[in-house]
């Protein structure tokens, strides 16, 4: 094992990467033959794009093959082929998509035939060398298809086997929603803390729709170049300038008249939304230096339709029910003044600014440089809650002001040492700061910042229980290098990808205290009698400790892969990737459980991958693939292991107001002699390993017409070593108790016997729960995906897809979701 790792490291260090289509780029390749089908070595091939100033001069090898890797995705490519004794071949107006290996089968006629071959658009609808399951959402689709809010990553849902997960708009690939990778021009912009796209789902959009040229969605079996994702990959390419100046301006407007009423709202709340921006791109120096710039703003006002629908506690007019003696009329009237703010339209806005800039410099044919920067600032008053209508009181009682700041930059250098070698180096910088705070405009005198529940009605406090918080402030630096080398029938690739992510979190739920009152009368007395020290609450909770924590994860990735053209009809893509994440270790531990001081980093993360593409007759293709894909460690997991050790943070839980040290409403405890019997300790299993998935595909693709294709795919996914939580503090079960089962009329119709669980039987009575995070979760996913694509021609383009899927899992999602195991 160590020898294999050493070999990978040495090869990566010496030659960095051999490649076909590097992330954020595409490639053009082909084989040149004569009329009899024999290959033609030594033919001169020129790949060019006049608008981008790109020229690549190549020579076919002994197998008649040529490859031009690391090309900028764009329209307008041309390929010319010259060989002594043969007529020139010329293909024009080729469109190269991100992640695509545009393969051309070129036949040359003898020189006696004076006709020049010219192809206006030779892009095949069946890609003969492709082995993954992917789709490109192109420039025309992005520009022409309608989209709500101009959030461009919503187009990902046009891909088979991809769907929304939950209520927040996360993307689920093959049933996996928590381990996807999001790349912009090859640089990782995934927020590692939650394993979601930068800015998450609260923002309007991470990138302006007008700044995106296209993106590739890899839903299954990507090559070894891609890592840190056991789900899917979204590979976005931004727009660049060219030799012609192009610009645009836009303004979009929406209001209540144009919006339908929410089905759960009692009225259609007012909304006014403006989105405006501009884009411009062109040359600074023709064929050498190009620029592109985009700016966009959003101003949105969309109040929340708020109410409290709990008739046993609050009447429709907004008054407490059941307040009486021993509370005085004045005390009952005092708490009634709290409620009107929960009814009606709660002000809410969402304002965002986006700026994007890019420079591309090609000083020579063999060197090109690119630099880009993206700026996002999002601020939303009362924007933690995003629903149009809320009837639980959470529009105030579990809400607050939200802000998101995302910055990311990229530098890349592509060099061509020879006609068969291309090297691409990139540096990425990424920050994502998400902060929430109380809204002072909805504060009520006498409540403070406590969490409040009265007679079962929650969300009566001043805001969400965790406010204020920074969750997280993430910063990442990334270095990656890829070098492509064509040797005979092999297009090989090795690479290295190093990233260091630092998360700062300031977050501790219920640190201001949480009061629960059993009835309205008790709350009315305490609300007006706090100066006299009244304590009539039913229970009280508060988290004590340190709210902030800093986590640094250093990810290392190395890979080797090869695209082998075995025959003109058979292509093999095979490779291996190794990943290692150096995890931070807790500085504060629980002496009762030394396990709280260590988090194991999985080291056996070798991931072999194999893909096969076989062309039956040029119009029918069979693909198959299999591979292992490791997930990245989320900051949510590490934060929980750092803070939930009963020392870093601990929770006081008082079940009676008779405690002398109990607080007087709305005060909180400043210090406490914590009784450990009410706390939880959590740690990682000593043999914790990296979760991964096994992915397999089998697909049949058929070209039905010149611009019409049909694909039928079987997708298989097995999640292995997923993270779950097991309580080690469960002791022996108590005596068996028999319960009688009655029907609606009270007649006994059966019995049910079950053993009892007694808290007194805990293994360690000092703690309520002792949780161990371990690899105990597995999942299975099987799907049949059918897609028909009509490529743009004669003013029409269409794509129709249907996915039938069956998923079985213990519980999927982020580690945060799995805490209930």
Residue ranges and their predicted role:
Residues 1-22:
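Cleavable N-terminal targeting peptides that direct proteins into the secretory/outer-membrane pathway or into
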Residues 21-41, 46, 50-821:
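Short acidic-glycine motifs
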């Amino acid at each position: 094992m160590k020898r294999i790792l050493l070999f990978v490291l040495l090869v990566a260090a010496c030659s960095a990467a051999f490649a076909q289509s590097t992330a954020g780029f595409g490639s053009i390749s082909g084989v040149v033959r004569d009329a009899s089908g024999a290959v033609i070595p030594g033919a001169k091939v020129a790949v060019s794009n006049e608008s981008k100033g790109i020229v690549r001069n190549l020579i076919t090898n002994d197998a008649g093959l040529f490859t031009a890797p690391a090309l900028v995705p764009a329209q307008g490519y041309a390929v010319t082929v010259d060989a002594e004794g043969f007529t020139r071949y010329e293909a024009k107006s080729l469109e190269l998509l991100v992640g695509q290996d545009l393969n051309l089968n070129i036949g040359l006629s003898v020189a006696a035939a004076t006709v020049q071959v010219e192809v206006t658009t030779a892009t095949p609808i069946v890609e003969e060398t492709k082995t993954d399951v992917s789709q490109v959402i192109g420039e025309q689709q992005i520009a022409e298809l309608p989209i709500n809010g101009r959030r461009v990553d919503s187009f990902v849902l046009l891909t088979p086997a991809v769907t929304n997960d939950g209520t927040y708009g996360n993307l689920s690939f093959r049933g996996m929603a928590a381990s996807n990778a999001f790349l912009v021009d090859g640089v990782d912009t995934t927020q590692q803390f939650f394993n979601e796209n930068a800015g998450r789902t609260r923002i309007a959009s991470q990138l302006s729709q007008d700044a995106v040229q296209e993106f590739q969605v890899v839903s299954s079996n990507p090559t070894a170049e891609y890592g840190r994702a056991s789900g899917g990959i979204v590979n976005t390419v931004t727009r660049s300038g060219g030799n012609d100046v192009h610009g645009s301006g836009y303004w979009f407007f929406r209001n209540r008249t144009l919006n339908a009423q929410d089905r759960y709202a009692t009225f259609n709340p007012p909304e006014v939304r403006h989105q405006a921006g501009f884009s411009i791109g062109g040359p600074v120096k023709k064929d050498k230096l190009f620029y592109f710039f985009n700016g966009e703003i959003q101003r949105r006002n969309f109040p929340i339709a708020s109410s409290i629908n709990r008739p046993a506690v609050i009447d429709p007019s907004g008054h407490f029910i059941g307040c009486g003696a021993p509370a005085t009329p004045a005390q009952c009237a005092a708490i009634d003044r709290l409620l009107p703010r929960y009814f009606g339209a709660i002000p809410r806005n969402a304002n965002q600014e986006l700026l994007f800039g890019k420079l591309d410099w090609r000083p020579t044919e063999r060197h090109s440089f690119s630099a880009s920067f993206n700026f996002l600032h999002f601020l939303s008053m009362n924007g933690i809650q995003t629903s149009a209508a809320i009837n639980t009181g959470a529009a105030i009682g579990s809400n607050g002001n939200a802000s998101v700041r995302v910055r990311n930059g990229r530098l890349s250098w592509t060099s061509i040492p020879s006609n068969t070698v291309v090297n691409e180096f990139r540096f990425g910088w990424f920050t994502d700061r998400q902060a929430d705070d109380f809204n002072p405009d909805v504060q009520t005198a006498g409540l403070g910042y406590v969490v409040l529940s009265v007679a079962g009605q929650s969300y009566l406090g001043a805001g969400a229980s965790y406010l204020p918080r920074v969750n997280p402030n993430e910063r990442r630096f990334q270095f990656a290098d890829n070098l492509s080398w064509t040797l005979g029938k092999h297009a090989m690739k090795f690479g290295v990808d190093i990233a260091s992510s630092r998360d700062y979190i300031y977050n501790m739920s219920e640190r201001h205290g949480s009061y629960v009152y059993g009835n309205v009368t008790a709350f009315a007395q305490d609300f007006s009698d706090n100066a006299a020290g009244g304590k009539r609450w039913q229970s009280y909770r508060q988290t004590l400790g340190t709210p902030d924590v800093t986590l640094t994860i250093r990810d290392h990735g190395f890979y080797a892969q090869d695209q082998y053209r075995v025959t003109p009809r058979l292509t093999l893509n095979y490779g291996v990737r190794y990943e290692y994440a150096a995890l931070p270790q807790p500085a504060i531990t629980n002496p009762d459980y030394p396990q709280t001081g260590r988090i194991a980093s999985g080291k056996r993360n070798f991931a072999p991958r194999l893909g096969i593409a076989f062309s039956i007759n040029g119009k029918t293709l069979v693909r198959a693939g299999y591979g292992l894909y490791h997930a990245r460690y989320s900051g949510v997991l590490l934060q929980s292991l750092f803070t939930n050790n009963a020392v870093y943070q601990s929770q006081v839980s008082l079940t009676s107001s008779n405690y002398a040290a109990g607080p007087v409403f709305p005060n909180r405890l400043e210090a406490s002699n914590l009784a450990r019997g009410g706390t939880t300790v959590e740690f990682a299993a000593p043999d914790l390993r990296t979760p991964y998935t096994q992915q397999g595909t089998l697909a049949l693709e058929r070209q039905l017409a010149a611009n019409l294709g049909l694909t039928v795919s079987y997708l298989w996914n097995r999640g292995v070593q997923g993270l779950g939580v097991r309580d080690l503090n469960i002791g022996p079960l108590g005596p068996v108790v028999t319960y009688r089962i009655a029907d609606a009329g009270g007649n006994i119709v059966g019995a049910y016997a079950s053993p009892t669980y007694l808290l007194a039987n805990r293994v360690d009575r000092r703690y309520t729960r002792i949780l161990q995070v371990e690899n105990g979760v597995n999942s299975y996913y099987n799907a049949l995906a059918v897609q028909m694509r009509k490529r743009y021609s004669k003013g029409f383009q269409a794509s129709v897809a249907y996915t039938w899927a069956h998923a079985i899992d213990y519980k999927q999602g982020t580690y945060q979701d799995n805490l209930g195991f």
